[in-house]
Curated annotation (Swiss-Prot):
The active site is at 179 (proton acceptor), 297 (proton acceptor). This is Ribulose bisphosphate carboxylase large chain. Pfam families: RuBisCO_large, RuBisCO_large_N. HAMAP family: RuBisCO_L_type1. It comes from Rhodomonas salina (Cryptomonas salina). Its cofactor is Mg(2+). It catalyses: 2 (2R)-3-phosphoglycerate + 2 H(+) = D-ribulose 1,5-bisphosphate + CO2 + H2O; D-ribulose 1,5-bisphosphate + O2 = 2-phosphoglycolate + (2R)-3-phosphoglycerate + 2 H(+). Substrate binds at residues 127, 177, 181, 298, 330, 382. The record marks 337 as: Transition state stabilizer. GO terms for biological process: reductive pentose-phosphate cycle. Binds 1 Mg(2+) ion per subunit. Heterohexadecamer of 8 large chains and 8 small chains. SUPFAM superfamilies: RuBisCo, C-terminal domain, RuBisCO, large subunit, small (N-terminal) domain.
Length: 488
């Protein structure tokens, strides 16, 4: 319903006096705002500076991430400014944190270019994090409308098609990162790839910082690595892969490396998060056109995702990367050496794998999300995991995951192939126990010990790593706890 003449006159008189007017009075706060299906929604954790009203702080975030500047500008009158202003519509105190608040903000869809993560992020995180009115600010979650998601390609391959190409079903996929990640020659690198795949892994991979250094140029690595893949595939009768990292200093170099991957016949290639949103989308489009599985290493994410009060929650990165077109993304292990609270990791995996997610505050999901027709993205678990944790990994992470045992393969006392075999046997015995209806979580250690009686490599691995864990407190944990009456 259109506003009355009196209402428009009042708004003009209130908002368009020269000078500085509080953001809330400028129209960036509306407690009665009715959310539209086409709105982009964002929820920020904000810590206002001392003396700053939380509502005004939320309005300032809405303003500075949409149309506002620090003073009244008359050119607002030349636009549909009331439509284009983002609306902060809700502010809640954070449980157990007296100085923190959750601010909910709605953005008109027309504020964003279709299919452009760069444009979306330029608004949502482009300027507000340096705003003096906030002592700290963190983007916790977003809701993308279906109309907006339809402008993005989504994963280049998706979980279902990836399994069809690999002909592997009913279990997690197994991988490992070549170690040491820097310093090997091409020939030795290819030997590691062969040993790991021959021993039973589905994938080997480059690490985030192996590109084209003086000790091993990229083409040398690709050729020797692919020789290892082909020999292992021929010897095992299984489809195998190696994630060749095509990350480079320019898009031209990345496309050259990607085309060479296609030429030599690999099923998968890899990029790093640090190449940027536009480059990631570009490679996602290339991968879809060229039937290539695209793995993303989340290199650099902890610089802004790990701290609880400032930066960005990793679940937002998961959403953006599913939109951008990657097929794999590292998303936590729960039991490994890297940051990963169980509830938070569950939220990340659901974000990547579910067709729809509902509000689940315990897992950190503040909005319901319909993923429209975007394919599923395969989570990857890596960092400090070993075969003795197999029952825990399957319990926490399920089947649609790549379990990557780098040190847990290449650090095996009997060699790389034995390390791979230990992981494959541990996985298969645990999946069989689960499928038979056994209590594999509690019986897991016994199941592994029984399997080890007929598998020397598994016995050696269990003897070496025993029950090694990395029991450090997570810095990013749930703000809400599940109670007996929750979700009723």
């Amino acid at each position: 319903m259109s506003q009355s003449v009196e209402s428009r006159t009042r708004i003009k008189n209130e908002r368009y006096e020269s000078g500085v007017i509080p953001y809330a009075k400028m129209g960036y706060w509306d407690a009665d705002y009715q959310i539209k299906d086409t709105d982009v929604l964002a929820m920020f954790r904000m810590t206002p500076q001392k003396g700053v009203d939380p509502v005004e702080c939320a309005a300032a975030i809405a303003g500075e991430s949409s149309t506002a500047t620090w003073t009244v500008v008359w050119t607002d009158l030349l636009t549909a400014c009331d439509l284009y202003r983002a609306k902060a519509y809700r502010v809640d105190p954070v449980p157990g944190a007296a100085d923190q608040y959750f601010a909910y903000i709605a953005y008109e869809l027309d504020l964003f270019e279709e299919g452009s993560l760069a444009n979306l992020t330029a608004s949502i995180i482009g300027n507000v994090f340096g705003f003096k009115a906030v002592n700290a600010l963190r983007l916790e979650d977003m809701r993308m409308p279906v109309a907006y998601l339809k402008t993005f390609q989504g994963p280049a391959t998706g979980v279902i098609v990836e399994r069809e190409r690999l002909d592997k079903y009913g279990r997690p996929l197994l991988g490992a990162t070549v170690k040491p990640k820097l310093g090997l020659s091409g020939k030795n690198y290819g030997r590691v790839v062969y040993e790991g795949l021959k021993g039973g892994l589905d994938f080997l991979k480059d690490d985030e910082n192996i590109n084209s250094q003086p000790f091993m140029r990229w083409k040398e690595r690709f050729l020797f690595g692919m020789e290892g893949v082909n020999r292992a595939a021929a010897g095992t009768g299984e489809i195998k892969g190696h994630y060749f990292n095509i990350t480079a200093g320019t898009m031209e170099d990345m496309y050259e490396r990607a085309e060479f991957c296609k030429e030599i016949g690999t099923v998968i290639c890899m990029i790093d998060l640090v190449i940027g949103y536009t480059a990631i989308q570009s490679m996602g489009i290339w991968a879809r056109k060229n039937s290539m599985i695209l793995h993303l290493h989340r290199a650099g994410n902890s610089t802004y995702s790990r701290q609880k009060t400032h930066g960005m929650n990793f679940r937002v990165i998961c959403k953006w990367m599913r939109m951008a077109g990657v097929d794999h993304i590292h998303a936590g292990t729960v039991v490994g050496k890297l940051e990963g609270d169980p509830l938070m990791v569950k939220g990340f995996y659901d974000t990547l794998l579910e067709v729809k997610t509902e509000v689940n505050l315990v897992e950190g999901l503040f909005f319901a999300q319909d993923w429209a027709s975007l394919a599923k993205c395969m989570p990857v678990a890596s960092g400090g995991i070993h075969c003795g944790q197999m029952h825990q990994l399957i319990n926490y992470l399920g089947d649609d995951v790549v379990l990557q045992f780098g040190g847990g393969t290449i650090g095996h006392p009997d060699g790389i192939q034995s390390g791979a075999t230990a992981n494959r046997v541990a996985l298969e015995c645990m999946v069989i126990a689960r499928n038979e209806g056994r209590d594999y979580v509690n019986e897991g250690p016994d199941i592994l010990r029984t399997a080890a009686k007929s598998c020397g490599p598994l016995q050696s691995a269990l003897d070496l790593w025993k029950d090694i864990t990395f029991n450090y407190a997570s810095t990013d944990t749930a703000d809400f706890v599940e109670t007996a009456t929750a979700n009723r």
